[in-house]
Amino acid sequence: FHDFTPSGLCEIHHFLFGDLYDWAGKYRIINIEKRERLLAGRSVWYSNDEEIPNDLESAFSALYQPNWDSLTREQFVSAISRCFPRIWQVHPFREGNTHTVVMMMTFFVEQHGYFMDQELLAASAGYVRDSFVMASLDQLSEYEHLERILLDAVQSAPIHYDVETLC
């Protein structure tokens, strides 16, 4: 997968959720709020449904800023910890945003020569989502938690999974 654009995000969402939702891969047409326990029941400020295309273009533009291949692994992780929450905060779909953004982030990591520990991310799905919440608070954003798990998940060498434990 090489399409790191809003249309690529829609393609991933449709692939993941096309069997579940008629609207898979299509931007939501309603505004949403999701109460977050981390925010004492308040919601992250997601994009207004009419602003989704513009907000996604802006969020994706951050992916084209750094010279990714010149970064160390730690710098790479720090940079993606700031870019992908911007995409997530748009929340272009009614459901499945975290899974879709993490899938795209995994493809992006692998496109740049690293490997993503899928077992770790799956086992820590709640922590990953909470980390996206904390990294999506505008001036109050906190990236430490997302960086921490991605430093563990983004590896320089292939990850060998124990097939016995996966089944």
Q: What would you call each of these model-derived segments?
A:
Residues 1-167:
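FIC/Doc superfamily catalytic core
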